[in-house]
Amino acid sequence: MADFEDRVSDEEKVRIAAKFITHAPPGEFNEVFNDVRLLLNNDNLLREGAAHAFAQYNMDQFTPVKIEGYEDQVLITEHGDLGNSRFLDPRNKISFKFDHLRKEASDPQPEEADGGLKSWRESCDSALRAYVKDHYSNGFCTVYAKTIDGQQTIIACIESHQFQPKNFWNGRWRSEWKFTITPPTAQVVGVLKIQVHYYEDGNVQLVSHKDVQDSVTVSNEAQTAKEFIKIIEHAENEYQTAISENYQTMSDTTFKALRRQLPVTRTKVDWNKILSYKIGKEMQNA
């Protein structure tokens, strides 16, 4: 073991550790981090070398965070990344510092970053909040307004999770939606992601995603936001229904096929006559 460790450079150790961390199941970052910490046995190397992995994990997972003094939680995403561990909360018009390891927000400061699209962002944010409240019992959303490659763009992010470690499962829903404000019609692009980990007497993960494309009529802010949410609702309902139907089909067919109906001999054992079988006699003589 010592010879192997001597052959592996610190850079390679950090790379392996970072990969474990970025692939941690939802709600299990701390468990994976603690395991990696024991394996690496070098806290300074882990914190300095794998810091980017902590940040990448939180942004990929749309980690929600509560900022002291503000009611709504905001999502940690690449779209809100301002650099130097600071992130944007467009709804509350602030930026804040985020500790990727402790998952805590601090130092809120005023920040205007809607790219001159305040009314568009607020209309979409208001409509999306109502949708998330109706459809996700533990859901959060953040809406950004940016100018990307010269195009005014709305980006909507949704996160909802259920962490049930006592029941040996954790799961998270994420979706991201974009459209450019280009009348009369704009393309809507979305990606939906589901990740669930079940680990009682086994280790099963569901990792699924779906890409969506649609179009929305761009008129005034309120009407466009309403049509935007209709597209989101239809696509997400359709995806969730398809996932449920697929699991029902798997339960009725695939999983049943995994269970052996008869022993290898293709003959059922008559337990009332077990003593007449050779194995029964051998057991009796044992």
Curated annotation (Swiss-Prot):
The keyword Cytoplasm applies. PANTHER family: F-ACTIN-CAPPING PROTEIN SUBUNIT ALPHA (PTHR10653), F-ACTIN-CAPPING PROTEIN SUBUNIT ALPHA-1 (PTHR10653:SF5). The modification N-acetylalanine is found at A2. Belongs to the F-actin-capping protein alpha subunit family. It comes from the Eukaryota. The modification Phosphoserine is found at S9. This is F-actin-capping protein subunit alpha-1. Component of the F-actin capping complex, composed of a heterodimer of an alpha and a beta subunit. Subunit of dynactin, a multiprotein complex part of a tripartite complex with dynein and a adapter, such as BICDL1, BICD2 or HOOK3. The dynactin complex is built around ACTR1A/ACTB filament and consists of an actin-related filament composed of a shoulder domain, a pointed end and a barbed end. Its length is defined by its flexible shoulder domain. The soulder is composed of 2 DCTN1 subunits, 4 DCTN2 and 2 DCTN3. One of its GO terms (biological process) is barbed-end actin filament capping. One of its GO terms (cellular component) is WASH complex. The modification N6-acetyllysine is found at K19, K97.
